[in-house]
Regions:
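Residues within membrane-spanning alpha-helices of integral membrane proteins
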Residues: 5, 49, 103-106, 110, ...
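Hydrophobic alpha-helical transmembrane segments in multi-pass integral membrane proteins
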Residues: 44, 85, 89-90, 139-145, ...
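Small-residue-rich hydrophobic segments that form or flank transmembrane alpha-helices
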Residues: 4-73, 133, 137, 145-203
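Membrane-interface helix caps of multi-pass small-molecule transporters
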Residues: 17, 21, 33, 84, ...
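Residues that define the loop-to-transmembrane-helix transition and helix capping
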Residues: 42, 70, 96-99, 127, ...
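Interfacial loop-to-transmembrane junctions
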Residues: 164, 209-230
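Membrane-interface helix termini and inter-helical loops of multi-pass transporters
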Residues: 87-97, 120-122, 183-195, 239-242
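Transmembrane helix exit motif
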Residues: 56-64, 92, 99-126, 212-213, ...
């Protein structure tokens, strides 16, 4: 087994474990290393999306009864439109200043929500949903990291961790399927991506099973703080890999 194959396998375990435990973070975790293992950045984001699709599909099937489509469509459709535009505009990512701003913003926002989450309740209005979908679309299209804006919306608007997980994963599943189609149209779905997906598939299965066990034992009252903490960690990861 080559070092690249082993790296993709191990990264897939870690990314799917995080996704299954916190509801997001697959792309943020795996994209810290995947661009260095793939021929191009576009192929790296495509592989990340394919593996994330597999993780989300397994979660959605298990929690499908918790999905409320009426609250999902506005943010999802906005995300699809914005991320499609962003992917078509993507040639290469060189804007280090934007990534620094993104990292700092995630850290500050997560700390704010940790401190004041009991006093904050995001309304499920169209304006809030469109705003979250727009930010998520920009981050997903350019960086393959569409999670944080949508997660902040769902964790504040859904009544239980099961509802949150079901809504977030349905959102990510449909969004990633769409983005993968657009990336394939732009030539990023190559034979290298296909083979590397098979290498990472076993890791996804292992990570998802481990994450499901941990998720089951996390009390509702502290779950959102775990999510906020990982958003903060995500900000530091983005800053360190800038």
């Amino acid at each position: 087994m080559s070092s690249i194959v082993l790296s993709i396998f191990l990264l897939s375990i870690g990314a799917s474990f995080i996704q299954r435990t916190t509801g997001f973070g697959f792309g943020i975790f795996i994209m810290t290393m995947l661009p260095f293992l793939m021929p191009t950045y576009g192929e790296a984001t495509t592989l990340s999306g394919l593996l994330a699709i597999t993780t989300s599909a397994a979660i959605v099937w298990r929690l499908r009864n918790y999905v409320t489509w009426q609250r999902l469509w506005p943010i999802l459709l906005t995300f699809i439109i914005v991320s499609t535009i962003a992917i078509f505009a993507l040639t290469r990512i060189e804007d280090h200043i934007l990534r620094r701003i993104l990292g700092v913003a995630l850290i500050l926002i997560s700390i704010y929500f940790m401190l004041f989450s009991q006093k904050i309740k995001l309304p499920t209005t169209k304006r809030v949903q469109v705003g979250a979908g727009t930010l998520s679309g920009l981050m997903g299209g350019f960086f393959g990291m569409q999670g944080p804006p949508a997660v902040l919306y769902f964790i504040q608007s859904e009544p239980t961790k099961e509802h949150y997980m079901a809504m977030a994963q349905t959102y990510f599943l449909i969004g990633n399927v769409m983005m993968t189609g657009v990336r394939a149209y732009n030539g990023f779905f190559t034979t290298t991506v296909a083979f590397d997906y098979l290498y990472g598939l076993g890791g996804v299965i292992i990570g998802t099973m481990l994450g499901a066990y941990v998720f089951k034992h996390i009390p509702n009252r502290i779950f959102r703080y775990i999510v906020y903490a990982y958003i903060c960690i995500s900000g530091f990861i983005i800053l360190m890999t800038n």
